[in-house]
């Protein structure tokens, strides 16, 4: 933690010489008032409204004025001492964060993405690392490159588990057993270091705290729950920000600051909290926290794909906030699993949530869909009709009768801006996962009969995958594991349980043979993963009860 007593001692004017020693309370970047084009810039006032105030307090007051978090004039007059200056400094945030957090006004280009190697520059070799992955979007966000590194001691932490399971019993007991066997079977990683948690529901937080070691780094993609986890730990264990100098010395808050933890705990936590936002890449620098007797480092998020689409480009701002704000997730869907029915048609009838994707079932199939993505759903005669309706919604400025169903911007105005994916054959239920968006459960009903492959059309640059329904998979696997005293694996070995999808040409008619061809290409260097390669595809899909999940293959 910055030693504010030292920073403010003898200061006659509030200037860059002081503010450079202060980090943005939101993104942890060092603050500066010299160059608006550089990170950490804050806006200085043009004039001083009250000459009675000391210059340094005036500047502090103005710095916060535009951010709607200034102290009242009475508070400053009654307490014009070092404590007031300290409190003000601790709340300072840069202009970029102020605009984004308080006015929802931000340019995605000001939130640049980082690579894994960029972030690992913050992490010394041999360090303890928690690889943070949102379980709700498993296996997306899981990075084998992190888990396989020999120069790091890595534990897998699965966040947002409350969006998958009804209660924490499965999270505590069943997930670690399943994941140990999944990692061994799928990635050849022998590790029993897995935790499933929910920071919002306080599931497994005490167990997590007891497990993680001193000087641990939280590593993962943007918006996977790192900062939310830190804030839960700060509240539970009276944690706070610290600053560690080049010699390794920990500079903790002053006694005055710590006293506020008891006199005004709400304000204390507000000052110490990690910056949580629906905006990706908000954190720009490493920030250390003292949590109980341990040091924990919050790292900026990293991206694994250079071709990844920024969701701000195609998706409406209000819809995007709903997608990203974890606390808005409605858990009644987990408990009730209310479904919508849809029959596949010869015209290519489709199901969509906001135009973010279009699911096209095969003709004659009867389907049930359980939606775990916020926003109302809508069915259309075909994709072209859906795109046409949403184009009209965008041009009508909200007056179109179907505007409430539109979650995309006018930039996605043609079918050519979507990629067509074929879903490999399945029987029963699957979950379709869209990265940074959420998932839906798709179930075919009635007696099994192959009628064709399901398709999903998604804007270019959005990553998608499928999995067997996760909660049922783990629950049934655990029961099998217990009944056989551990002789049977809780993670199936007879079939893949996750898969990437297969991109199809828009005019491809024989999607099943096209899927097999792509499958053989993808597994060319992974021959051990191949299954049913000698079977005729159309004979194979007649016997899915015995030959489950043909052509399923996940590309890490």
From Swiss-Prot:
One of its GO terms (cellular component) is mitochondrion. SUPFAM superfamilies: P-loop containing nucleoside triphosphate hydrolases (SSF52540). InterPro entries: G_CP_dom, GTP-bd, Mito_lipid_metab_GTPase, P-loop_NTPase. Residues 113-305 form the CP-type G domain. CDD domains: YqeH (cd01855). It is found in: Mitochondrion. It comes from the Eukaryota. The keyword Mitochondrion applies. Coiled coil: none annotated. GO terms for molecular function: GTP binding. Residues 1-21 form a transit peptide. Belongs to the TRAFAC class YlqF/YawG GTPase family. GEP3 subfamily. This is Genetic interactor of prohibitins 3, mitochondrial. It comes from Saccharomyces cerevisiae (strain RM11-1a) (Baker's yeast).
């Amino acid at each position: 933690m910055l030693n504010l007593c030292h920073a403010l001692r003898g200061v006659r004017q509030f200037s860059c010489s002081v503010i450079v020693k202060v980090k943005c309370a939101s993104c942890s970047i060092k603050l500066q008032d010299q160059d608006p084009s550089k990170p950490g810039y804050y806006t200085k006032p043009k004039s001083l409204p009250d000459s009675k105030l000391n210059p340094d307090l005036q500047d502090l007051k103005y710095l916060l004025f535009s951010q709607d978090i200034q102290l009242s004039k009475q508070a400053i007059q009654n307490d014009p001492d070092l404590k007031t200056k300290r409190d003000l400094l601790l709340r300072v945030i840069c202009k970029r964060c102020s605009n984004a957090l308080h006015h929802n006004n931000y340019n995605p280009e000001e939130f640049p993405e980082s690579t894994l190697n960029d972030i690992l520059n913050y992490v010394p070799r041999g360090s303890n690392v928690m690889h943070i992955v949102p379980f709700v979007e498993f296996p997306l966000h899981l990075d084998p490159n992190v888990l396989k590194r020999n120069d790091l001691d890595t534990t897998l932490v699965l966040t947002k588990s409350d969006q998958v399971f009804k209660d924490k019993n499965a999270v505590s007991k069943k997930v670690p057993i399943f994941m140990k066997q999944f990692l061994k079977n799928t990635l050849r990683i022998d590790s029993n270091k897995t935790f499933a948690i929910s920071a919002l529901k306080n599931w497994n937080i005490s167990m997590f705290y007891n497990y993680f070691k001193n000087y641990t780094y939280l590593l993962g993609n943007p918006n996977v729950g790192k900062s939310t986890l830190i804030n839960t730990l700060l509240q539970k264990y009276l944690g706070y920000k610290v600053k560690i100098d080049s010699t390794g010395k920990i500079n903790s808050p002053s006694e005055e600051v710590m006293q506020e933890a008891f006199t005004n705990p709400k304000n204390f936590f507000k000052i110490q909290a990690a910056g949580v936002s629906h905006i990706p890449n908000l954190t720009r620098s490493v920030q250390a926290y003292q949590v109980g007797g341990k040091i924990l480092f919050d790292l900026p998020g990293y991206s694994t794909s250079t071709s990844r689409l920024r969701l701000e480009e195609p998706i409406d701002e209000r819809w995007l906030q709903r997608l990203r704000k974890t606390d808005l997730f409605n858990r009644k869907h987990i408990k009730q699993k209310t479904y919508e029915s849809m029959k596949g048609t010869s015209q290519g009838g489709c199901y969509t949530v906001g135009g973010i994707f279009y699911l096209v079932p095969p003709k004659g199939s009867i389907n049930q869909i359980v939606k775990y993505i916020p926003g109302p759903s809508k069915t259309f005669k075909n994709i072209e009709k859906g795109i046409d309706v949403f184009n009209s919604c965008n041009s009508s400025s909200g007056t179109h009768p179907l505007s409430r169903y539109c979650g995309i911007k006018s930039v996605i105005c043609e079918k050519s801006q979507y990629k067509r994916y074929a879903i490999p054959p399945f029987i029963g239920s699957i979950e379709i996962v869209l990265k940074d968006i959420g998932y839906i459960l798709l179930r075919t009903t009635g007696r099994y009969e192959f009628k064709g492959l399901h398709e999903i059309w998604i804007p270019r640059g959005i990553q998608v995958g499928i999995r067997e329904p996760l909660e049922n998979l783990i629950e049934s696997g655990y029961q099998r594991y217990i009944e056989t005293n551990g002789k049977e694996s809780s993670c199936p070995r007879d079939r893949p349980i996750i898969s990437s999808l297969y991109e199809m040409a828009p005019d491809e008619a024989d999607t099943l043979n096209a899927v097999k061809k792509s499958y053989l290409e993808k597994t060319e260097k992974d021959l051990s993963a191949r299954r049913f390669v000698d079977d005729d595809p159309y004979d194979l899909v007649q016997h899915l009860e015995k030959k489950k999940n043909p052509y399923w293959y996940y590309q890490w």
